[in-house]
Amino acid sequence: MQTHKAKRVEIIIEAPMERRLTEALLRAGVTGFTVLPVMGGSGRSGHWTREGQVGRAGMVAVICLIRPDRLDALLDAAFTVVERHIGVVSITEAEVLRAERF
C-alpha cells in the first residue's frame, strides 16, 4: 500500500487557550485537528497533574497531520498563541494512507 509523507504537529497548551489556538490554525488553512485532554506530565517546572499546578482547566493536546508544505503556516499561527502561554510544540515525520485528506 502506498503511503505519503506528512508532518505530525502536537501542541500542548493550557485548556483555556484551545479555542484561540484552533481558530488561529483554521485561519492558517489547517483543515483538521484532534483535541485531547492531557492528564498530567513533567517538565521544566516539575511534575504536574490536571488537578494540581495547572488548575482545574488543565492542559490539552492539539494534534494535526498536515502536508509538509503547510508546516510553516501552521507553526506561525501556533506561535502567535503559544509564545505567551504555557505550551510545547513538537513536530515529527509521519506517513498517511490518504494524502487527499491532508
Model-derived features: positions:
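Positively charged, small/polar-rich N-terminal and surface patches that mediate targeting and assembly
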Residues: 1-102
